[in-house]
Amino acid sequence: MEEVRDCRLEEGLSVEGLVECYRDIHGFMAGHLAEAVEVLREGLEASSVRVLTFTGNLVATGLRGVLAQLIDGGLFNVVFTTAGALDHDIARFMGGKYLKGRFEADDTELHRRGVHRLGNVFIPVESYGPLVERFVRTLAEQAAGVRGEWGVYELLRLAGSLMEGDRDSILAAAARRGVDVFVPGWPDGAFGTSLFMERQRGTSITVDYFRDMARLADIFFPQEGEAAALIVGGGISKHHAIWWSQFRGGLDYAVYVTTAVEYDGSLSGAHPREAVSWGKIKESSRRVVVYGDATITLPVIAYCLLHGCG
């Protein structure tokens, strides 16, 4: 066993130096974060299937640009996320103003003023729903002009092409890099509701998620090579990633970044070792959990993946 070493913070300390400091500190999540960087660097280099999952709330923060950069950097070739991520990515592309607020704000007063609150981010009503609706109308009309039936991932590829020019857009980055974005809960937000309303208005478009599942089968059923995943947060995007991974024998590398705990039996809090029992992560895998707010931990991890640490 290595000894715990004391860390000294010298002037001009780099991110690489900070991660080395975390490795020396070791207790308690510092060592986990340093190990996560090691696992991901090894896994992303070795794997043919490289998965990134994240929850929609993060896209309402400035972490949106970091997530887009991870995709644009070619580190991942499969993305799983939630309907909220689509809404926030589109709304911000359309000029929506997301404001720095406070957790302890008066929500009744915010409602009366037409402001949504997402944690300590304030979203004026006009910066959200109406912008997504306007974008989806254009998207649906363009899609219907090509063909009648679409998978969700195919629509999102088209959406990303319409968002080209926004370097911080997740969908635009995915479209540029040819990365498929899968959103199993796609109806559960403004994007899905707006598509439904366009269908009700008479736009000739049908969404068939079985097309997405066929594409996922193409990705995950082949047994060649290895698979790695960076899973940020929990919920449906986390589960869809590990669910499909079981069909190739499980993930070879897995890093979870979460604030959820396993003691309530929730999917979001479930530890990688629990996924081993389901065959979703391999017994022989390299795996680590980093407990902490992703808006703090992920930028450090992402920097090391993009620019190198250690």
Curated annotation (Swiss-Prot):
GO cellular component, one term: cytoplasm
Pathway connected to this protein: Protein modification; eIF5A hypusination
Record-listed E.C. numbers: 2.5.1.46
Entry-linked InterPro entries: Deoxyhypus_synthase_arc, Deoxyhypusine_synthase, Deoxyhypusine_synthase_sf, DHS-like_NAD/FAD-binding_dom
One Pfam family per UniProt: DS
Record: active site: K280
Keyword NAD included in the entry's annotation: yes
Any GO MF annotation of the entry: deoxyhypusine synthase activity
Cofactor or coenzyme needed: NAD(+)
Enzyme class: transferase
Residues in coiled coil: none
Keyword annotations: Hypusine biosynthesis, NAD, Transferase
Reaction(s) this enzyme catalyzes, per UniProt: [eIF5A protein]-L-lysine + spermidine = [eIF5A protein]-deoxyhypusine + propane-1,3-diamine
Family: Belongs to the deoxyhypusine synthase family.
Role this protein plays: Catalyzes the NAD-dependent oxidative cleavage of spermidine and the subsequent transfer of the butylamine moiety of spermidine to the epsilon-amino group of a specific lysine residue of the eIF-5A precursor protein to form the intermediate deoxyhypusine residue.
HAMAP family attached to this UniProt entry: DHS
Protein name: Probable deoxyhypusine synthase
Organism name: Aeropyrum pernix (strain ATCC 700893 / DSM 11879 / JCM 9820 / NBRC 100138 / K1)
